[in-house]
Curated annotation (Swiss-Prot):
Residues 163-199 are annotated as: Disordered. Belongs to the dCTP deaminase family. The record marks G116, F117 as: Important for bifunctional activity. InterPro entries: dCTP_deaminase, dUTPase-like_sf, dUTPase_trimeric. Its EC number is 3.5.4.30. This is dCTP deaminase, dUMP-forming. It comes from Nocardia farcinica (strain IFM 10152).
Length: 199
């Protein structure tokens, strides 16, 4: 069930749902508008010959922060990571879905490529996967509305919500645009397993 504005306000007032800092005018009929933080992760194409999800590639991206009062310019075909200004905390019986803003989509800005789902129990800044599919650069202003968070009530609370030991939560408590930790989804090579077991 998708939560209405009344439900969203009730969850916030009860202290079960956290969106900080929250302005009242960000609550929409069935979502909460989220704003863009000021940090971005840009890809450095000179560090690696290719992207390998199975490998830890710490130098694949670097953190960029525009000067005070300045936008970040996203060029045509460019892909960067951003994050929400708000820290979002979901209880164990609510899941979230991040959607783009219609006005920005009409300009060619994609807010996320595939990862718009937020698990129950998640807490942290939401990382945005920003793409420019337009033919001109797009200026991204820190603090601008960048997306909308829809909230869904589960049929029952999650047995192992995000952040619990059983969930394997790689991004719990993330601050700012957080690079991929996909390598943690791959089994360790046998020599690495031997090294860990010998400790």
């Amino acid at each position: 069930m998708l939560l209405s504005d009344r439900d969203i306000r009730a969850e916030i007032a009860a202290g079960r749902l956290g969106v900080e800092p929250l302005l009242e005018n960000l609550i929409q009929p069935s979502s909460i508008d989220v704003r863009l933080d000021r940090m971005f992760r840009v890809f450095d194409n000179s560090r690696y010959t290719h992207i390998d999800p199975a490998q830890r590639q710490d130098e694949l991206t670097s953190l960029v922060e525009p000067g005070e009062g300045e936008p970040f310019v996203l060029h045509p075909g460019e892909f960067v990571l951003g994050s929400t200004l708000e820290v979002c905390t979901l209880p164990d019986d609510l899941a979230g879905r991040l959607e783009g803003k219609s006005s920005l989509g009409r300009l060619g800005l994609l807010t996320h490529s595939t990862a718009g789902f937020i698990d129950p129990g998640f807490s942290g800044h939401i990382t945005l996967e920003l793409s420019n599919v337009a033919n001109l650069p797009i200026t991204l202003w820190p603090g601008m509305k960048i997306g909308q968070l829809c909230l869904f009530r589960l049929s029952s609370p999650a047995e192992h919500p995000y952040g619990s030991a059983a969930a394997g939560s790689k991004y719990q408590g993330q601050r700012g645009p957080t690079p991929s930790r996909s390598y943690l989804n791959f089994p360790l090579p046998s020599d690495a397993v031997d090294a860990v077991e010998s400790r």
